[in-house]
Amino acid sequence: MHILPIRPKAGRLLISLLCSLLFTLPAHAQEADTAGVKELQGVEVVGRHVTGKLRHDSLGGMSLDLSFLDDMPRIAGNADPIRYTQLLPSVQTNSELDAGLYVQGCDNAHNGVSINGVQLYDIQHILGIFSVFNPSHYSRLQFAGSAFTASAANRLGGFIDMQRPDTLAGRVKGELSVGLISSQGTLHLPLGGKSELILSGRGAYINLLYGRWLKVEESAIRYSFCDANVTWLYRPNAHNTLWLDFYGGNDRMDYQEDGEKYDARLGWGNRMVSMNWEWKRQGLVLRQTAYMTRYGNRFSIERPDFRLRMPSGITDYGYRLSLRRGRWTAGTEWALHSIRPQQPETEGERQTTTLSATRRHSTEGSLWADCKFAVARNVELLGGLRANVYTIRRSAFFSADPVLSLLWTPGYGQFRLTANVKHQYLFRTGLSAVNLPTDFWLPADERLRPQYAYGLSGEYRTDLIPGRLQLSAGLYYKRLYRQTEYIGTPFELIYGDYDYRKNLISGKGKNYGLDLMIEKRTGRITGWMSYSLGRALRRYPGRFSGTFPAGHERIHEFNAVATWKAGRRWSFGATLVWAGGTPFTPPSYFYLQNGNLLSQFGDYNSGRLSTYIRLDVSATCRIKVHGGRESGLNFSVYNANCRHNDLFWRLKFNDGQYYYAPLRPLPKKLPFLPSINYYIKF
């Protein structure tokens, strides 16, 4: 049994804040929820202002207004949009150093994460503590747990798209946030009446103040990152919009292990450039995008007797076109993938190996169409088909991915039922079980054939109290085929004849689950609570016996998110995560052989980490608000409940004794992370 260590007063405050999502409903108790009244020929129309920032569409997608993050708890000074996406139903919460995003039981590599429709790869800063997305540069986040239309990219999992503002600011405006370990800012510059330049940047100086405390046990860590966004928006008339997007970011981390006397260095980063044109006339919308997106990492380890380097990367050049008119949508997308798989270079006393840095090139093309039409009263049908062709060397693969959604809207809510087939032609794998940047991308080929999935999902959504309290319940089921697992060890990189193809095995899996969510959308207190029950099972014949849970599976998860506008100056936010532990492979016993410690492990992923519980809280004080200008302070505490959650288990040696114990990210003397940020908006 796990007990949440919260002091009585803090516990009462937390319970009051979260329970208010359900029980703080009367209008007389909510000053910010004042009804607007207009009189039309003797008829009184009452409209209630929706203050919640989460919106749902009829197909099961969600849109999150990123101004929601202003009042939420911050980690290391950042309120990260991807972190808050993990609090939505069907999305799993990560532990502190897991950089993955797991949607409806799928792996991290199954997701499509993009900026205005352009894919980004490996979107983490600080090993997943927050992402590459600077929230002040974007207006909203669009999320879908699965492919609900044929226009969705060739991915088996969920989809996240960071979207630009729809309108020109018309004046100089911006915001700046300064914290103890990082700062960030955004500036909107009008260039005449029809054009605007948006500049954003972030940088970390964590080593300057916290270098002496950045340790995992006795191992020192040095870390830094920076990123930048540039968007140029031009709207010459009501029919045309052009924009250019740029993103660039770099991370660097050094890790020194005193006991083992080695130095590990890791650098990774993204680049993305896109040119976009949107044309609208008489109900027809045409959008075209040409883009380049690139990800690369540089990993090296040095010891007195050897040196190891493992660079890898992926670059895409692509073009996308879409047409929309009325109930019809159609389009095409073509991309050239240039992939550098991980090819280690070793130098040492035992051997020196230099493998050629071979790049693998492949092309991927798609044509799609969607149509939505009424089949009966209150019943609509959305059907779509995506035709794909993928080529690499002398091999070609063809597929047809249909999607069908049935929408029924009686007088008491909306029902949705969706079935789809999806193919994916890129794989991500590596030594890490927590999606570290050392993992690498691979193209499908004649040996590693494309993966695919069959999916079925359903959802019911209704207003328990119209406009105020909304309930949604969903089910999903997916069958996954040609899933890849990497079974190599670090020793093969150093001492063996390394070939990543020899360490890849193929199998299949199935994901299924239930998602429940209740959202309070009006009043001073808004937010949501959600519960997910799900399984993600895998089977690799000939390698592991039977069926086992995927390494990211959390069977149970409860999330609560709340914001409270306490007055003109003060606002408060809180998030609570209570989730089951993820699987790991426990050892059966250890033994010494010729002076070497060897371990015999049990069944694959047969153990579980302890329950994951984390409470984050924040308070925002608006010091000055005048004439469109605002300044204030944000105080946040990460892991305010002071719980030591497990990252993973590992072998330790202490005082001549070997033992197996969990690694925990926060020190015993400071099991929480406070942060303070000063911000200015103008």
Each model region followed by its residue ranges:
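Flexible loop and strand-edge segments within Gram-negative outer membrane beta-barrel domains
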Residues: 31, 221, 239-318, 352, ...
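Periplasmic N-terminal accessory/gating domains of Gram-negative outer-membrane beta-barrel systems
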Residues: 56-148, 165
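Transmembrane beta-barrel wall of Gram-negative outer-membrane proteins
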Residues: 181-203, 217-252, 265-287, 325-328, ...
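Surface-exposed extracellular loop regions of Gram-negative outer-membrane beta-barrel proteins
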Residues: 296, 345-347, 408-456, 475-501, ...
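Outer membrane beta-barrel strand-and-loop segments of large Gram-negative receptors
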Residues: 314-322, 356-368, 449, 466-528, ...
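Gram-negative outer-membrane beta-barrel transporters
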Residues: 374-380, 477-479, 502-588
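C-terminal beta-signal and adjacent terminal beta-strands/loops
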Residues: 569, 578-594, 614, 621-682
